Amino acid sequence: MAERYNDDWRGWPVRPHDEQHPVRGSFLDPRPDRQVGAIYHNGVDIAVRDDRPEPGAPARRTHRVYAIERGRVEAASRPGIRGLVDIGHFRYEHVDARVRVGESVDAGEMVGWTCEGTWHVHLGERAVGDDGVRRWVNALRPGGKVHPYVDRAKPEVEEIRYYTPAAPAWGRRIGHVVRLPQAGRRLDKRRLAGIVDVRVRADDPQSFLGWFRDLPWLAAPHHPFRLAVTVVHLGTGEIVDRHEVFRSDRYLRLPAGQHYAPGTDQNMPANGCLRHHRTARCPGIYWFRVFPEPYWDTRRLANGRYRLRVRVWDAAGNTAKRDSDVTIRN
């Protein structure tokens, strides 16, 4: 997705602007929602060290936040509260605003402070799609304003499993984060029949840790940038299915409970992780549905042996794959 910005400035919204910062909460991560159980994270959480405030920080504030694009302030919470600022394509959340609606701001100009206890600034980005609607997009996608962003670690496809379809309600785990509990009966991939829910566990480890080296329990893999599947009949070599499961350059319309598969856990926020890392797992677990509802109808295929090849990419272009051979017996 290409986007025309108001200027050519590139960098990060916290100092130093020209150096990479660790990101712990990634775009499209699951997040709690009172009405539907869970929705998608609409930005990226750029980490700051609350235990090392910048010089001159006011009480209960830790780091200065800067605009990464020139523009007029479209929204700003009143000073003194944990709120947000909207300028140009970008939203800066969990900040104590230091600008007012209507003001003109240059890229690199301070717009607020991060708030103690949050350990990050949430950076959201919106762009107008082909349909003219403004939607959230991934600020770490190739060609965006956040630069430099380097990730030399390959994403991982850890496991492929087969289940009877199930759509459990989202629950919670320690730290008040969401989880989609295990549900459905696991199937023997040597005897698949009928409707099958194909589930893949995959994630994107980060090669850049920054100050997470000092607090290693805060390091967590990201949501992969892209995932695709190819299904091949092993007897004939025919490709019977090939499709992109998702691409996380923009906000998804698919409900979170169909994008994610049972077994998914949200990444624990930094403040919760610091409290519970000795007794609970901080990183999230990503399980994805390869065929969202109505799932994979094996009755449409001839009986026989097939190979599912799942390929995953990260935002830096690294890729990995995993094969799973199955037998359909309807």
Predicted segments, located by residue:
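Short peripheral tails and domain-boundary helices/loops at the edges of structured domains
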Residues: 127-154
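A residue-level detector for short acidic-glycine micro-motifs
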Residues: 25, 48, 75, 94-97, ...
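Short hydrophobic beta/alpha edge segments that flank linear recognition/processing sites
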Residues: 84-87, 105-123, 144-148
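Long, low-complexity serine/threonine/glycine- and acidic-rich segments characteristic of extracellular
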Residues: 168-330
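Proline-centered linker/hinge motifs at extracellular inter-domain junctions
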Residues: 148-172, 176
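A structural signal for short beta-strand/turn segments enriched in small hydrophobics and glycine
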Residues: 23, 65-67, 71-73, 102-114
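Zn2+-dependent peptidoglycan hydrolase active-site motif and core
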Residues: 58-98, 119-125
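Short glycine/threonine/proline-enriched tight-turn/helix- or strand-capping micro-motif at secondary-structure
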Residues: 3-7, 21-67, 90, 168-187, ...
